[in-house]
Every structure is written in structure tokens, then in C-alpha cells.
Swiss-Prot record:
Protein name: Phycocyanobilin:ferredoxin oxidoreductase
Purpose: Catalyzes the four-electron reduction of biliverdin IX-alpha (2-electron reduction at both the A and D rings); the reaction proceeds via an isolatable 2-electron intermediate, 181,182-dihydrobiliverdin.
EC code(s) of this entry: 1.3.7.5
Keywords from the UniProt entry: Oxidoreductase
GO molecular function list: cobalt ion binding; phycocyanobilin:ferredoxin oxidoreductase activity
GO terms for biological process, alphabetical: phytochromobilin biosynthetic process
Organism: Prochlorococcus marinus (strain MIT 9303)
Length: 264
């Protein structure tokens, strides 16, 4: 197994969410891996209890801008459900080249549930990065969920990438790879699906703690730390500022990508 240096250095790696197809017909089709993972996420998302749309300003649903003379398109879907305060899926496309899928499910701090996150970075040359994880925000991973993850077979990916400097937010189950073939791309989708199934089972079975419980306060603090760490990705902010403006970039990062958990 080859370990590849360079962690999360794509200019828009952490643009997150799951999206509908872009209205623009210019440029190549969405990469098959992005399409496959997006479809699988939508399929699993529909199984969550009490799923409903997350309030979203219409101007943030489908966004376009210019970056270095190329059109930057971003499309977002946001939902919430019992146990998860925000489910965000996004696909971003820059001209006919770079494509990014990002998905993140943030738990309600009253529930002992982890954060689900997945990202794919694609270009005409192929997939440069694919990452999936369930990041705990409690002191430990819930036992049932831990057992579910431990039972999942981990594919023998040939190229495993190094985590970024702020990678302490991830769990021991994080998989950050560069798929070497279409077979490995299929393995990655199936692995992400396994993580989603384990999470959904936990969401269905979970019961909330009181808002003032020590466990809730601790999970709220940990989730806030997760969001702060993600906001430190200066490349994401730089790309958004260049394509739009600093004020818009701040709003997108704070309200869409890494919105802090509401006060308890």
C-alpha cells in the first residue's frame, strides 16, 4: 500500500454538500464517482426519521461565480431530521475541470451521534482525493456504532493519503485515499455506504439527553471545536473570496459549510 503525501491541498476541497445536477450543460459530465456517491447518500438520507428541508436562503441553493476566467458553480441541498441538526450535500464545479463533492451530517448535540463527512475531488485526470469518516463528538464512539464500524471490511486501497495537520478531528476509521481504479472507486462508495448505514441505525435507536446534561454540553463543545477546525482551511476561504467577495465567503462558510451548533 502506497502512502501519498499531501493532505487536502485542492483549492476547494472543503466545499461540502450533496447537490442536484447543475443547470449548466457546458463542460464534461459529473464524474461517475461523484454521481454514484451522491446517489447513495440521497438513498440513505431518505431513510432517516422525520426528515425535512433545512431552511435555506434561495440565493444559496444554486450559486455561480467567476474564478480565473472560469465559471464556478455550486449547488446545495440541506435537510434536518430527528437526531441530526443539519445534513448538507454539495457539488462544486469549476469550468470543465475541477469537481468537488462534499457531504456533512451534523448531529443534534443532545444525541450521542458522530459527524458523518465525505469529500471527493475530481478533475479530467481522475480522482485526486476521496475521504470518508464518522467523527465522534462525544468522549467515545457509541458502543453499537463502534461495533458496526469494526465489522466493516476495509478495502485494500493502493494509495492512502496523509491527513491534514488539523486531522485530529477525525476518527481512527477515517479513510483518505486516491482511488487507483474504477474498482477502487466502487469500493469507496460501498465503504461510505457502510458508514451511512451504521449511522442511520444509530440515529433511529438514539434517544436525546437533556439540553443541560453534562454529556450534551460536552458534545456541543466538541462539535463547536470541529467547526472551528474546519474553518481554518484558508484555501476554501481564499477561493470563495476570489470568486465572490470576502463578505459573501464569510457568510457561506459560517452559514452553509460549517455553521456552529445553536446555543443550548
Amino acid at each position: 500500500m502506497e502512502r501519498v503525501r499531501g493532505a487536502c491541498q485542492s483549492p476547494i476541497l472543503i466545499l461540502l454538500a450533496i447537490v442536484l445536477p447543475f443547470p449548466s450543460t457546458s463542460g464534461p459530465a459529473i464524474h461517475p464517482l461523484i454521481e454514484s456517491l451522491a446517489a447513495r447518500i440521497r438513498q440513505r438520507r431518505a431513510q432517516l426519521p422525520e426528515l425535512s428541508p433545512f431552511a435555506l436562503d434561495s440565493v444559496m441553493e444554486s450559486i455561480s461565480g467567476q474564478l480565473d476566467g472560469e465559471e464556478l458553480l455550486i449547488s446545495n441541498e440541506l435537510h434536518r431530521c430527528r437526531g441530526l441538526r443539519k445534513l448538507h450535500l454539495e457539488i462544486a464545479r469549476l469550468g470543465g475541470g475541477l469537481q468537488v463533492l462534499h457531504c456533512v451530517f451534523f448531529p443534534d448535540p443532545r444525541f450521542d451521534l458522530p459527524i458523518f463527512g465525505a469529500d471527493i475531488v475530481a478533475s479530467p485526470a481522475g480522482i485526486s482525493a476521496a475521504i470518508v469518516d464518522l467523527s465522534p463528538v462525544g468522549l467515545t464512539m457509541p458502543v453499537a456504532l463502534l461495533h458496526g464500524l469494526e465489522s466493516l471490511p476495509i478495502p485494500a486501497f493502493q494509495q492512502v493519503r496523509e491527513l491534514p495537520a488539523w486531522g485530529s478531528i477525525f476518527s481512527p476509521f477515517v479513510q483518505f485515499i486516491r482511488p487507483a481504479s474504477s474498482e477502487e472507486e466502487s469500493w469507496f462508495v460501498d465503504l461510505a455506504d457502510g458508514y451511512l448505514k451504521a449511522l442511520i441505525s444509530s440515529v433511529i435507536d438514539a434517544t436525546p439527553d437533556a439540553s443541560d446534561a453534562a454529556s450534551t454540553i460536552q458534545r456541543h463543545k466538541s462539535q463547536l471545536s470541529y467547526c472551528i477546525q474546519q474553518k481554518r482551511n484558508d484555501k476554501t476561504r481564499g477561493v470563495l473570496e476570489k470568486a465572490f467577495n470576502p463578505q459573501w465567503a464569510d457568510r457561506y462558510i459560517e452559514e452553509i459549510l460549517f455553521e456552529d451548533p445553536p446555543p443550548l
